[in-house]
Regions:
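NAD(P)H-binding glycine-rich loop region in Rossmannoid oxidoreductase-like domains
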Residues: 49-88
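Active-site Tyr-X1-5-Lys
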Residues: 119-122, 133-161, 190
């Protein structure tokens, strides 16, 4: 057994895929979430990351030595309840960090997001250290946690590894994000339903297949600390697409999806996010390359729905 890993938010859009992959790599995994488990076939406990006493109990009971912290409120839902989003995303991050300090656990994986960038971030091609003035409370909360992450790493108190994820394409139901359309379109195509898109047809955003996101994250966690050149999160991306281009790809693989547009508040969020990502730092440091392009992502995910 390589590591004993606790995963928060394990039933969410990303967590469930990390559970399966980490178990397949001979790790012990304790999955946790705030709701009952009807999805995962592994040890599971109810855990709210705001409950430090419960967290301390679980870390000791299961002899945990790593945490993957996915518990969060996402971008679109976050705008509907900014104060709760700040509390869950930021206090939750600090609670997990404090639990690790108390229990002598050094290593944490925590996902950041392209939401940390803003309109001053050279959105046509965003490098790892662009100016950041996020326009959503989700992005603000992620950026605040990035600064805390830098502090813990710089002071050598913890070893927190992180990637700024773009839109993630998987067969799990979307969870309240601005890139949800990418998966919703696949579901409607497979179910032969019409789709109404909440973004403009030419809105370009970076995306990646969930397997690429998982593989890159675990590879980053497994690398020697000396090979990690950043104390803050790495950029990552696989491809860029727009609703109109994604529609063309879906039709090219044999699904006659009908789509119209009803643009909502998420357009303003998307307009403040990168169109393309420079992820050369991650690729150079851990020798990572994606396995899925846009066509193969659509084909693979729609087959799984």
């Amino acid at each position: 057994m390589k590591n004993r890993i606790l995963i928060t938010g394990a039933l969410g859009q990303l967590g469930q895929f990390f559970v399966k992959s980490l178990i397949s790599k001979n790790n012990y995994v304790l999955a946790t979430d705030i709701k009952e488990n009807k999805l995962l076939n592994c040890d599971f406990e109810i855990f709210d990351i705001m409950d430090e006493e419960r967290g301390d109990y679980l870390l000791k009971k299961y002899n945990i030595n790593q945490i993957y912290n996915f518990a969060a409120i996402l971008s679109a839902k976050g705008e509907q309840n900014p104060l709760l989003t700040w509390e869950i995303n930021n206090a939750g991050f600090i609670n997990i960090a404090n639990l690790c300090l108390k229990n002598n656990i050094k290593k944490i994986f925590w996902p950041s997001s392209i939401a940390v960038f803003g309109r001053n971030s050279n959105l046509d091609l965003v490098n790892n250290d662009e100016p950041m003035h996020p326009e959503t409370i989700y992005g603000v909360s992620k950026l605040a946690c990035e600064k805390a992450m830098f502090y813990f790493n710089y002071k050598n108190l913890l070893d927190i590894r992180s990637i700024r994820f773009p839109g993630i394409v998987s067969n799990s139901k979307p969870g309240g994000g601005t890139t949800d359309y990418i998966v919703e379109m696949l579901y409607c195509a497979k179910q032969k339903k019409n789709y109404t898109c909440f973004l403009k047809d030419d809105t370009i955003l970076p995306m990646m297949h969930v397997n690429d996101a998982v593989d890159a994250s675990i590879k980053l966690m497994e690398f020697d600390k000396g090979a990690i050149s950043l104390n803050h999160p790495y950029n990552i991306s696989s491809f860029e697409t727009s609703p109109s281009k994604w529609l063309e790809i879906i039709r090219s693989i044999g699904f006659d999806l009908n789509m119209n547009y009803n643009v909502d508040f998420r357009q303003n969020i998307a307009d403040s996010w990168p169109k393309r990502i420079d992820d050369s730092s991650l690729r150079n440091d851990i020798k990572w390359v994606p396995n899925f392009n846009d066509f193969h992502t659509a084909k693979n995910i729609i087959d799984l729905i």
